[in-house]
Design a protein with these regions (language model features):
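Conserved class I S-adenosyl-L-methionine
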Residues: 20-30
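S-adenosyl-L-methionine
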Residues: 1-19, 36, 58-87
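Class I S-adenosyl-L-methionine
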Residues: 3-8, 82, 100-230
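Conserved SAM-binding motif I beta-strand of class I
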Residues: 46-51
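Conserved SAM/SAH-binding beta-strand->alpha-helix loop
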Residues: 53-55
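Short SAM/SAH-binding signature in class I
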Residues: 88-96
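Conserved SAM-binding loop of SAM-dependent methyltransferases across substrates and taxa
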Residues: 31-44
Length: 230
């Protein structure tokens, strides 16, 4: 099975953290490609392919049957994390949705899943919101990556439970503490692109005293300072 570059990056991040006895739930699994791949590659022992809609879950069941993984990949219908309450899940992956929706899913049931020690998350937008919520609620960022799939850039973030009192900054939430430190090429490309977009916004604002102009100008300076600090 060949995964998309986005899913392949997520799988690689999971592999770095998983042991053979870990059980993973993939939330919003769509076709079930990720959990099937992880089990097939012996990265994890058991996976739960979870989705809120019958259609995607039916596609997952087809993938599971085609790969003859019925004993190791279990499809579950339900909203967010609810289907895995009471299951021996130790890792959770959520990808392909916005950051606000992702946080809503985590807020609803994560507190009931004390055995979950690792989250592997890929938000399409608003990654800062995911970082801020989890880092303020007993989780730390232990790994980050950025991947290009077709014309889109995606950030993958790995969180672990922690008792440590780690002081993250707003810059950590916005840019990612590890990505900001390492600044891989795709990270630079993402934020250089953002600067171009914001400069076009500046050019469209005639009133330089307008709050939007001041805010956009401040954002540009911040991004350029981050990029020049490496």
């Amino acid at each position: 099975m060949k995964l998309s570059k986005r899913l392949d990056c997520i799988a690689a991040m999971i592999k770095k953290q998983a042991s053979s006895d870990d059980q993973l739930a993939d939330i919003g699994t769509d076709h079930g490609y990720l959990p099937c791949f992880l089990v097939k590659q012996n990265i994890i022992s058991t996976a739960y392919a979870c989705d809120v809609s019958e259609g995607p879950l039916s596609s997952s069941k087809e993938t599971i049957q085609q790969m003859q993984l019925q004993d190791h990949v279990i499809p579950l219908l339900g909203d967010g994390l609810e289907p895995i309450i009471g299951k021996p899940v130790t890792m959770v992956s959520i990808s392909g949705m916005g950051g606000f929706l992702m946080v809503d899913i985590l807020k609803a049931h994560l507190a009931k899943l004390n055995q979950v020690h690792t989250l592997i998350l890929q938000a399409n937008i608003c990654e800062y919101f995911v970082r801020e919520y989890l880092c303020s609620n007993g989780w730390e960022i232990i790994d980050e990556a950025i991947v290009k799939d077709l014309h889109h850039l995606y950030e993958v973030i790995v969180f672990k439970r922690t008792d440590k009192n780690i002081e993250y900054t707003m810059l950590d939430y916005r840019y990612g503490p590890i990505l900001r430190k390492d600044q891989p090429l795709l990270f630079k490309q993402k934020w250089q692109r953002e600067v171009k977009i914001k400069k076009r916004i500046l050019d469209s604002i005639q009133d330089h005293t307008h709050p939007k102009f001041q805010e956009t100008q401040s954002d540009i300076r911040e991004i350029e300072a981050i990029l020049n600090d490496h």
